[in-house]
Each structure stands twice: as structure tokens, then as C-alpha cells.
């Protein structure tokens, strides 16, 4: 008998991609101790953004379990639009930092 596992669809924060689905996801070893949901903005591999950062590395594309884990991170858009309300933080500073990566929060 087959086992069916329900999984959450990744990248629920995406609104629109320019053309095809050519998003720059990179595998990053994230060392934040706690679990983080998809859509968390990362200041760096060890820190979730708090809203005041001038630069970020990207947005988690997958849920990250507790402890160190290698996960997909959206590090650059093509350009791409993301849903600001679905991100962990969407202050003006974070929106500006994401725009520098061609990721536009709407």
C-alpha cells in the first residue's frame, strides 16, 4: 500500500516571475538554531533578518528544521515579485535590501 504524505508547497511567497521559472535558488547551510518557515528573510546564514538590515542574503524557499541545515534560499530575482505579507519582515530597509537582489516585495 502506498503512503501518501501531505507537504506544504514551497515558495508560497512568490507572486510573479519574469518569464519562466528561472529563480536563483542556492543551497545555503543555515546555522540559525531554531526552525524557520519558508519566507523568512535571512540577514546571513546565521541570522534571520529583524527588519533593520541594509543587506540580506535572500529568502528561505523551504521550511528549515531546528539546528543547522542545508536549505534552498532565493538569492536573486530575475526580476521577481514576492508577497511582502508572506515574508518574515517587510520593513522599508528589508524591501530596499531585497530590491538590490532584484527581488521586489509587493
Over which residues does each language-model region extend?
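Surface-exposed, low-hydrophobicity beta-strand/loop segments enriched in small/polar/acidic residues
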Residues: 1-106
Amino acid at each position: 500500500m502506498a503512503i501518501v504524505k501531505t507537504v506544504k508547497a514551497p515558495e508560497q511567497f512568490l507572486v510573479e516571475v519574469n518569464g519562466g521559472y528561472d529563480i536563483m535558488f542556492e543551497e545555503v547551510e543555515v546555522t540559525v538554531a531554531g526552525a524557520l518557515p519558508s519566507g523568512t528573510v535571512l540577514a546571513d546564514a546565521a541570522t534571520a533578518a529583524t527588519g533593520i538590515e541594509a543587506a540580506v542574503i535572500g529568502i528561505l524557499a523551504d521550511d528549515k528544521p531546528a539546528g543547522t541545515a542545508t536549505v534552498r534560499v532565493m538569492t536573486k530575482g530575475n526580476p521577481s515579485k514576492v508577497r511582502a505579507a508572506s515574508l518574515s519582515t517587510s520593513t522599508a530597509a528589508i524591501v530596499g535590501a531585497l530590491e538590490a537582489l532584484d527581488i521586489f516585495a509587493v
